[in-house]
């Protein structure tokens, strides 16, 4: 026991001294999107506790409406006494005074058609930061796929960095046009021809030692019937100069590892496999971890037979050279919209007496995949198991898929009669009648097509392409106690395909030249699942939970519903004669933003009447330790940092940023 305690103390010291959390002039920083390179979203700040949680007040609000902010996806970074964030469809870069919430400076890239086309324009999630000879530098990737380096104090583009991009209005220095390094024909103003494909960005780059590593985004696969696209290759640049360093091909070319997983010569003309989720890094070992999207398109891959590396994978690359250290593919020949949605989380574990430098990936599938982050060896066995074949003409799925044997799943995987709403005989009968037109099955239940031999409407997929863990609620981790916390929900999809030429008519501004044999059968993400006639979800609650794992053992510590049962659900259950003791707290059904501190796990959701709330949970049991009404709903992340001696909690509230602190931190109080 003494050895374990000593290890925790030593680890606490190392966390305090790590580059992502190092103190600077009375400021406990929030260095990256996830606070540290490990993306733990953990703060060492401890002024706030369950005892004073109820005393939190709004210290200030920053309103991004003038910058066109809408979604609130960006988690600000607090570095050297300033907050840095992005906002709006033009992805303004903004520096904010953390004491007052006043804008210090802002920068906006000149408008271009290639940026205005972006379907991820208002999806900016934050900035990256580095130092050049002691000078702070803010780095941003724009919707138009330009990399810009700004002086952290002034917001002015760096001199003698990057190269002229050949577009009117852009600075002569401080910018890199990254399209030139992808290797496709393009126009600096218009971008890559849309019939070829499209590349944009939502997550920030990451600085690993002296290398800037850049991911990217593509057009959503559920909004397309086309088969042509460009690959989302990973790019890297020199931090000091902006010079190009390397490119990693996410769709392997002839002679490269994994090329044989692309049959039908699909590697030549299809694409995606982007890395739209944030990246993580291990600077000490010069490794960067890339979570990838699926290949073009969602729900049908008959034109791209094979396992399709490196789709739906995690890739560990040497940050200096771009060489692959290892990879693991979570889903072979991915068609379920099971892309990898959140940053990998790095933790140093002690498993059965063995110290393991680990990386943990939460997924939509309801599994935590855990690896030795240096070698890629699974910490616990992952087995290939048989899965159903497709009945859709032209589709050939992998006969097996990886199955995590430990830790236990955190979400409902698949749906059967036992999962349906059945609290009364009438509710059960209605559930069964509703599901008669749908094919139920396991996690890898494949889509079906219209006019299928079974006469069914769609195939159920649970927890669904929007279920499990997703980008709206990044996981958090306590690296001192090695506990991993995640927010999950069930959001089953009903997968229905129609002929590609018909599907193409459903999508506005279609740009492809060749359509797939089959494609998504409805506009939007996919066919929504059927609802119970009562208005409830067709499956039993809880609908959303926070799950905690002890990652040294893989055991679940607790599972608790998020928020409170919505009043509309209570009313339905009351009419059906179902007491609350039977259905319990259903959870709101929402994914929730979280941050973890030395004394509590903080999250935001809603009370039964829709009131926005903040809850502080006991980190060991999940029990509510404190709660308070929040000023607004928040999502996509939460952060906590110290400025001028006081701890703040930052909420991302749509177009605004809301800073909470104790009364002593209020700007007008004069407290220091």
Where are these regions (language model features)?
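Bacterial N-terminal signal peptides that target proteins for export
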Residues: 1-10
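Bacterial N-terminal signal peptides
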Residues: 9-20
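Mature N-terminal segment immediately following signal peptide/propeptide cleavage
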Residues: 25-65, 547
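Short, solvent-exposed loop/turn elements at domain surfaces
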Residues: 37-43, 66-71, 94, 298-299, ...
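Short aromatic-glycine motifs in intrinsically disordered, low-complexity regions
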Residues: 40-48, 145, 306, 463-464, ...
């Amino acid at each position: 026991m003494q050895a374990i305690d000593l290890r925790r103390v030593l680890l606490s010291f190392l966390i305090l001294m790590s580059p992502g959390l190092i103190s600077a002039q009375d400021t406990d920083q929030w260095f990256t999107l996830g606070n540290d390179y490990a993306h733990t979203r953990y703060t060492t700040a401890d002024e706030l506790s369950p005892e004073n949680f109820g005393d939190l007040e709004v210290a200030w609000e920053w309103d991004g409406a003038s910058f066109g902010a809408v979604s609130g996806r960006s988690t600000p970074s607090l570095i050297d006494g300033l907050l840095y964030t992005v906002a709006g469809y033009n992805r303004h870069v903004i520096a904010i005074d953390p004491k007052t919430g006043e804008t210090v400076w802002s920068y906006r890239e000149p408008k271009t058609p290639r940026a205005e086309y972006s379907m991820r324009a208002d999806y900016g999630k934050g900035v990256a930061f580095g130092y050049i000879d002691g000078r702070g530098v803010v780095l941003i990737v724009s919707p138009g796929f330009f990399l810009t380096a700004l002086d952290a104090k002034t917001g002015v583009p760096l001199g003698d960095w990057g190269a002229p991009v050949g577009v009117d209005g852009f600075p002569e220095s401080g910018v890199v046009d990254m399209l030139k390094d992808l290797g496709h024909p393009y126009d600096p103003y218009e971008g890559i021809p849309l019939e070829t494909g499209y590349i944009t960005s939502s997550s920030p780059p990451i600085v690993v030692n002296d290398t800037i590593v850049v991911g990217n985004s593509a057009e959503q696969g559920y909004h397309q019937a086309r088969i042509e696209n460009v690959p989302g290759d990973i790019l890297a640049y020199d931090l000091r100069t902006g010079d190009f360093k390397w490119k990693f091909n996410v769709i392997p070319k002839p002679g490269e590892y994994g090329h044989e997983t692309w049959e039908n010569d699909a590697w030549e003309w299809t694409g995606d496999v982007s890395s739209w989720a944030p990246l993580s890094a291990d600077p000490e070992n010069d490794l960067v971890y890339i979570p990838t999207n699926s290949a073009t398109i969602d729900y049908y891959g008959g034109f791209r037979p094979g396992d399709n590396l490196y789709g739906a994978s995690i890739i560990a690359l040497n940050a200096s050279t771009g060489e692959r250290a290892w990879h693991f593919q979570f889903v072979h020949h991915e068609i379920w919209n099971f892309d990898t949605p959140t940053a990998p989380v790095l933790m140093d574990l002690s498993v059965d007496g063995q110290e393991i430098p680990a990386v943990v990936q939460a997924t939509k599938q309801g599994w935590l995949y855990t690896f030795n982050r240096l070698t890629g060896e699974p910490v616990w066995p992952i087995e290939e198991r048989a899965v159903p074949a497709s009945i859709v003409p032209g589709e050939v799925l992998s006969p097996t898929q990886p199955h995590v044997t430990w830790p236990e799943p955190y979400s409902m995987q698949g749906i059967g009669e036992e999962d349906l709403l059945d609290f009364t005989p009438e509710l059960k009968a209605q559930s069964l009648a509703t599901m008669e037109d749908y094919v139920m099955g396991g996690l890898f239940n494949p889509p079906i097509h219209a006019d299928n031999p079974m006469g069914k409407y769609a195939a159920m997929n649970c927890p669904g392409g929007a279920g499990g863990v997703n980008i709206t609620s990044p996981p958090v981790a306590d690296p001192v106690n090695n506990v991993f916390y995640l927010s999950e929900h069930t959001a089953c999809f009903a997968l229905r395909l129609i002929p590609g030429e018909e599907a193409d008519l459903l999508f506005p501004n279609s740009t492809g030249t060749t359509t797939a044999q089959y494609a998504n059968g409805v506009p939007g993400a996919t066919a929504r699942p059927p609802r119970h006639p009562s208005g409830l979800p067709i499956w039993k609650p809880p609908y959303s939970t926070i799950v905690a794992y002890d990652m040294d053992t893989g055991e679940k510590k607790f599972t608790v519903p998020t928020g409170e049962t919505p009043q509309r659900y209570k009313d339905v259950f009351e009419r059906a004669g179902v007491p609350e003791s039977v259905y319990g707290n259903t959870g709101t059904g929402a994914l929730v933003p979280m941050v973890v501190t030395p004394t509590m796990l903080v999250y935001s959701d809603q009370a039964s009447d829709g009131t926005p709330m903040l809850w502080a949970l006991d980190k060991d049991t999940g029990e509510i330790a404190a709660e308070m009404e929040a000023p607004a709903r928040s999502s996509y992340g939460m952060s906590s940092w110290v400025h001028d001696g006081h701890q703040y909690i930052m909420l991302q509230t749509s177009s605004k940023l809301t800073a909470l602190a104790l009364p002593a931190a209020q700007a007008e109080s004069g407290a220091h």
